[in-house]
C-alpha cells in the first residue's frame, strides 16, 4: 500500500472523529507522534490538534508505523454515510453497544479498535465487486456442470500451493485467498506479493532508499451461468 492518506491528511475530516476515539486509535503510536511534536495528552472530550496531526500524516516517511497506515486506510474506506448500516450490523453482531448519536466514522474507528479483521475482510469483499477486465476460460466439455458444493471451503491448501508458486517466482509467500459467493458466480480475491523494489526516499532531511515488496490483488471469477 502506498504511503498516502488522502482525505485523512485534511484536518476537517480528522475533526469528524470523536476526540476519545481518535486518541484511542493513535495511542499505540504515541511515541512516533510525540517525536514529531504532536501531543496526545489532551484526549478524552478535549479536541486534539487536528491541524498538526494532518501535517504529520501529509508527510509520511519510512518511520511512519505501518499499523497506523493500515488503520487509517481501512477506516477512511468506511467513513462515508452510505456504509453506516453495514457497520451497524457488524457492530451488533459483535456485541458492541451503539449509541443513538453514533456517527459513521466513529463507528468505523470503534469497529477497527474492537476487531480490525472485521473491517479488513469487508474491504476485501468490496474489492471483489469492482468491475475488472478478465481473461475467460471455458470448460473443455460445455455439457458438464460445475458442482459448487464440491468446491472447498477451506482455502488453506490453495494458499500453500500459491505460496510455493510465488516463492519460486521470487514474489514471497503469505498469500491470502478470500471467497465470496454471489448470484450465479463465485469470486476469489487473491492477494500476493510482487517482486521487490527499492525506491529513493527521504528520512527527515537525509536522502536514502526504501526497500519493500509491493502487494497485488487478483480476482478469479467462476461464472456458473456461462460455465467459465
Which residues make up each language-model segment?
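Broad, structure-driven detector of short, well-ordered beta-strand segments within folded domains
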Residues: 220-224
